[in-house]
Amino acid sequence: MMPLAEAGALAQGGGPSATEWACILRRKTPRHKQPTLLMVRASRRSGKTSAVLKAGRQSVSGRKNSTSKDLVTLGASSLREERGHPLHPRHRKAVHLRTRGRTRGWVQTLARMSRRTRGPVERAAAAAAAAAGGDAGHAPFPPPPAADGARAPRSPGQVTPRGLRLRLPRRESLLRGLCRPLRPLLGFRESDSAKPASLRLLQHTPSARRNYRIAGARLMRSNYPPPLSSAALRGAGPTRRN
């Protein structure tokens, strides 16, 4: 119950002002209040005690900074950092790399490097492997697999160690073109049939000649109208004249 003196003061218009009431309510009310139903569901699901839930609620409201793993309301980023997965410096996301069955931090692989960066890295790795000579107790790591879009070079003399393709001289390219099977290019004077090709209609194959015949017949039919005795000009009725 409210004391009589305080009740009389409130009745006479005294007591704290509106600003003081706002400050009192702001101090008593937490900033981010977690609903009780969600706290009960979380406690039932995970078996947490009310003290743990209260500590988590305080950490969310900003009153107390807690780094315990048992709190229900911890953020995903803090959990990732505690588990040992570093965050990417640009995207702030945990990036994993598999090395012998274990996940490690973000490392730039050879597939993502540019040509200028990949060349010195590959040469340094080859020099380190040659210096080790396989005495380290295990076999050296196999070379990284090629990318999906990359294909094997046609000949070993075409690709430099840095991955750049060399242009062949004109004589070698000419010989390379002569070594392939010679196919007749069907042009104006060439044909795959024994009959000479017409200069007016370039009919190279039997199928092309058939298409030209069909097209010519349609053209003749469209240019000249049908005769008057044709069935196209008669009335198409069910009865006929006697």
UniProtKB/Swiss-Prot annotation:
Q: Where do the segments described as Disordered lie?
A: 43-70, 112-162
Compositional bias (Polar residues) at which positions? 58-70
List, as start-end ranges, the regions of compositional bias called Low complexity.
Answer: 122-139, 147-162
Please name one Pfam family that this protein belongs to: DUF5550
Q: Under which name does UniProt file this protein?
A: Uncharacterized protein LINC03040
